[in-house]
Regions:
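A conserved amphipathic helix/loop scaffold
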Residues: 1-180
Length: 180
């Protein structure tokens, strides 16, 4: 019925009983992903790089799936190593939904960017610059919007929201209620 799924490298390797599935990766997810893994390289903690279509470059490490798109579109390609120019991240439209496959372990800023792009594409509100481990949940109904702002850390956190600064004590939650 729609939605967005993000799968990462090694998805589909094992079944629910922890037994290896003896098929080409991503095994049972191949039709969802719209691609298959042509080859992979366990690079450990050495860094490789990937490039998005806008030219921005991000580091990746540990594992590099060389993806062969079938129905999926390429979101990013490897920018180094013997697989330079090969697909690293895909997006596939499946039914009414979208499936992303990230074939490597990326730096945090790339994950943040991918999630932000997905949120914007799906119309889900996104707060730029939200500190790590601070979350905002919004509920609406009966002409009211209620936002719950959680600090899930043991340190004081501050953030800008609607042009004003909000300071949160360790593990504090604040509620912001507005009429719509």
């Amino acid at each position: 019925n729609g939605g967005t799924v993000i799968l990462t490298n090694r998805s589909g390797v094992k079944d629910k009983f922890n037994k290896c599935i003896m098929q080409q990766l991503p095994t049972v997810y191949r039709s969802l992903v719209g691609a298959y893994i042509e080859e992979y390289d366990p690079i450990g903690y050495d860094n490789a790089t990937i490039r998005l279509s806008d030219g921005s470059v991000y580091k990746c490490r540990q594992w590099c799936d060389v993806i062969q798109p079938e129905t999926a579109e390429t979101v990013a390609t490897y920018n180094s190593e013997f697989y330079k120019g090969k697909t690293a991240i895909t997006r596939n439209h499946y039914g009414n939904g979208t499936v992303y496959y990230i074939g490597t372990v990326c730096e945090k800023s790339l994950y943040n960017r991918i999630v932000k792009d997905i949120l914007v594409d799906t119309g889900i509100p996104y707060v730029d610059g939200l500190p790590d481990n601070v979350e905002i949940t919004t509920r609406t109904g009966d002409g009211i919007e209620a936002r719950f702002i959680f600090n899930n850390t043991n340190k004081e956190q501050s953030l800008m929201l609607d042009g004003g600064e909000i300071c949160l004590a360790p593990f504090e939650m604040k509620t912001d209620i507005k009429k719509m």
